[in-house]
């Protein structure tokens, strides 16, 4: 049934749902930053998604949703590797090196890489002049963020300390990995229920993250009792607000609003993350950050306005 044929929900419900995917998801980047100050990054990431995945999976089971088949579990593990191990793994790791607001801006390039995936992998998108300009704007934005200084001629230079190169590259790899997963999800067998599919993927991702964390030796010398209440609050926020409430609001909005309108979270989240990082985390907010962020967000706005398809992957767990 089309969105226009459905009974429109109460306006306040729509506003609350948008507030969740705009502001709750935007604040998750700062919560990650808080957590990885005390907990090893991949272990903290694993704790989040094991907990969230288990709760979502049990929720889907309680609703009598059909259990994933063996093939669907294999698909879930493949997507979970790309989304949770690579994308989120690099995000949590990078936030030890890169301000949370900058991390959010760099990850806002995901729509650009998704567009490239649709061109290269799916063949459902053409490289038009408008898309080319949008992609170049996104690249320029990241280049500005990573540069040491920018000579503006008579206007002077945009200087300041550059962001950590390894952290920035890790975030870009994560964005590319997410875009590949989004393209593959349209071809892989997955549970019909978005709730069950998301729960399975988060569980699979959390399990793999635990294994990678252990292999990297993150557990050695780490003691849960030494973790402060602030870090635990950050974890609870990520599980219940970021993953569960955010996912619920996102799926609900997809049933009541156009995908293009719902997709606007992609360029609101970075702004929220930068503001929160500046005011609560004391993160730098210079002219170069504003300029680079402007280019990235201009790219995101252009690309998301061109794409009106419902995502096949639960974009889900912010």
Question: PLM features: residue spans?
Answer:
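C-terminal-most transmembrane helix of multi-pass membrane proteins
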Residues: 2-7, 49-50, 58-60, 148, ...
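Hydrophobic alpha-helical transmembrane segments of multi-pass integral membrane proteins
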Residues: 13-17, 43-58, 78, 131-144, ...
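Specific transmembrane alpha-helical segments of multi-pass solute transporters/efflux pumps
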Residues: 24, 28-29, 55-107, 143-144, ...
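Juxtamembrane C-cap of transmembrane helices in multi-pass membrane transport proteins
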Residues: 28-39, 51, 88-98, 106, ...
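Membrane-interface helix termini and inter-helical loops of multi-pass transporters
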Residues: 30-38, 93-96, 146-163, 216-230, ...
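Hydrophobic/aromatic residues within transmembrane alpha-helices
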Residues: 35, 44, 48, 94, ...
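Specific alpha-helical transmembrane segments that line the substrate/conduction pathway
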Residues: 43-54, 83, 88-130, 135, ...
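Hydrophobic transmembrane alpha-helices of multi-pass small-molecule transport proteins
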Residues: 56, 109, 117, 129-150, ...
